[in-house]
């Protein structure tokens, strides 16, 4: 879905990558990054075939969609009541809006996805719907996937994402935009697992309206290079955000988690816990930014980071 809509996005993304070049350590967000690994991702050709992976059956009652960057994930699928594809005008209006709201539409990983993704899964959620499972697999080359979910007022969704990859010459670029209407509830799980050498860059942009609840739990392990970036904005405050993350690194892997939460209104809540386990010569990074401007009175934000070093040669920042 969205090939026609994404063509100008791809052109703008490619132009942006040429203009920006690769990030440098002079930029605070990339100061600790192994830029050689980033350069290796930039050199990868786009994956030319859909990867095949052996995965267990979907949970009972859940809807599983496969995102491989090559095919329309909705082809031949009957969606349950409450889940509908966005129309073309709706997609043109909504695509990229949450990225803009979160201030990350022109970041390098997002521009890489803009330049590379040829399909977008765009769904509207009404009421309470069955659990949704999105499975993405990557093998040789760069696999780029993009998802847009609009939760209407009082909608409820349980979303599980599984990102898999094999081989040092494979990388996964993923961008997810989420808009939660008033009193909407989203429980979001992300499991990203690889064979030890592949690369991952995942951006999760979330826009919350008042009295909405967003709970995000992520587990990242096995990637030679991994960068996960959840970014949340509570547009008028009065919303609840819960972020729980675990990064497990070994060998010479580098796993980074960069989060940003902004409160644009009063009475917002944040509960965040990030855990890292680092062994061998691995390196884990956590950077959590919280923005509470003057209008965000009575904000209650809690953030904790816990680390476990399994080797005296491992590093945590």
Which sequence ranges carry the predicted segments?
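N-terminal leader/transition segments
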Residues: 1-145, 152-154, 163, 309, ...
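Conserved beta-strand/loop scaffold segments within soluble protein domains that form the structured core
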Residues: 90-317
């Amino acid at each position: 879905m969205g090939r026609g809509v994404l063509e100008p996005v791809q052109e703008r993304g490619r132009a942006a990558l040429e203009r920006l070049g690769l990030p440098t350590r002079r930029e605070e967000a990339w100061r600790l990054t192994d830029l050689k690994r980033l350069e290796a991702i930039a050199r990868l050709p786009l994956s030319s075939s859909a990867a095949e992976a052996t995965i267990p059956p979907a949970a009972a009652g859940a809807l599983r969609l496969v995102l491989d960057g090559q095919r329309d994930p909705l082809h031949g699928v009957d969606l349950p009541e409450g889940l509908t594809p966005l129309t073309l005008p709706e997609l043109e209006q909504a695509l990229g809006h949450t990225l803009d709201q979160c201030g990350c539409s022109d970041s390098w990983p997002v521009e890489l996805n803009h330049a590379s993704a040829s399909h977008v899964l765009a769904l509207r959620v009404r009421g309470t719907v069955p659990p949704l499972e999105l499975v993405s697999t990557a093998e040789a080359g760069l696999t780029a996937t993009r998802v847009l979910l609009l939760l209407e007022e009082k909608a409820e969704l349980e979303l599980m994402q599984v990102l898999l990859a094999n081989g040092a010459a494979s990388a996964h670029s993923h961008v997810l935009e989420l808009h939660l209407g008033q009193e909407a509830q989203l429980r979001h799980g992300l499991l990203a697992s690889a064979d030890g050498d592949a690369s991952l860059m995942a951006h999760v942009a979330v826009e919350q309206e008042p009295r909405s609840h967003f709970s995000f739990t992520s587990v990242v392990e096995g990637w030679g290079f991994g960068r996960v970036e959840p970014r949340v904005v509570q547009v008028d405050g009065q919303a609840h955000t819960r972020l729980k993350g675990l990064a497990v690194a070994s060998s010479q892997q580098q796993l980074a988690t960069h989060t940003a939460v902004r409160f644009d209104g009063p009475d917002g809540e944040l509960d965040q816990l990030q855990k890292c386990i680092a062994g061998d010569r691995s390196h884990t990074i956590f950077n959590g930014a919280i923005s509470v401007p003057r209008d965000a009175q009575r904000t209650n934000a809690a953030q904790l980071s816990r680390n476990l070093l399994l080797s005296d040669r491992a590093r945590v920042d």
